[in-house]
Regions:
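Active-site loops and adjacent core secondary-structure elements that bind or stabilize anionic groups
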Residues: 1
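Short, structured beta-strand segments at or near domain termini in extracellular proteins/domains
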Residues: 145-156
C-alpha cells in the first residue's frame, strides 16, 4: 500500500481517492491501457448537469476547501466536483459559432491558448463560482498540476 507523509507521520493512502498530479498524456495512456477513453468535454458536461446544484458547500472559515463530496448520481457517477479537475479529450478551442465581443482582448488567443486540453470539474482549491458544469478550465498536455486527474468513458 502506498503511504503519504503528513504532519501526523506516515499515513495509508485511500485507494478509492482520485489519482491526481498527472498530465494529459498520462491520463490518456491510462485510459487506453484500461480499454476505455477520456470523455469529450460535451460528454462530461452532460453527465455533470445531473449533479449540478449538489456541489458541496465551501466554508470561508476553512479556506476554500470543499467539506464533503456531492452524492452519486442515479447512474453511479460521483466525484465530478471537488476532487480534482478532470482531463477531457477535447482541445481548448472556441465553441462552434463563437464570436468575440467587440473590443474583447480575445479569450481564445492562439499564442496563449493553443495546444491545451479542456479540464472539467473542480478541486478543493477551486473558487465556488467556477464549480459548475459549464465552466471550462484548460492545461497543457505535457504538464502536471496537483489538481488534475481523470475520468474514464466507455463506448456502449
Amino acid at each position: 500500500m502506498y503511504k503519504r507523509q503528513t504532519h501526523a507521520g506516515w499515513q495509508d493512502r485511500d485507494p478509492a481517492a482520485p489519482v491526481t498530479h498527472i498530465s494529459y498524456f498520462e491520463a490518456d495512456a491510462f485510459a487506453s491501457w484500461a480499454g476505455q477513453r477520456l470523455p469529450t468535454e460535451f460528454e462530461w458536461e452532460a453527465i455533470a448537469r445531473g449533479q449540478e446544484g449538489q456541489a458541496p458547500a465551501h466554508d470561508p472559515h476553512e479556506g476554500n476547501q470543499l467539506d464533503e463530496a456531492a452524492p452519486p448520481l442515479p447512474h453511479g457517477s460521483s466525484g465530478l466536483f471537488g476532487d480534482c479537475w478532470q482531463f477531457t479529450r477535447s482541445a481548448y478551442l472556441p465553441y462552434p459559432r463563437f464570436q468575440p465581443a467587440e473590443g474583447a482582448v480575445g479569450e481564445y488567443n492562439g499564442k496563449f491558448m493553443s495546444g491545451q486540453f479542456v479540464l472539467r470539474g473542480a478541486s478543493c482549491a477551486t473558487a465556488r463560482g467556477h464549480s459548475r458544469a459549464s465552466y471550462r478550465n484548460f492545461f497543457y498536455p505535457h504538464q502536471r498540476w496537483q489538481f488534475t486527474g481523470l475520468r474514464l468513458a466507455k463506448d456502449i
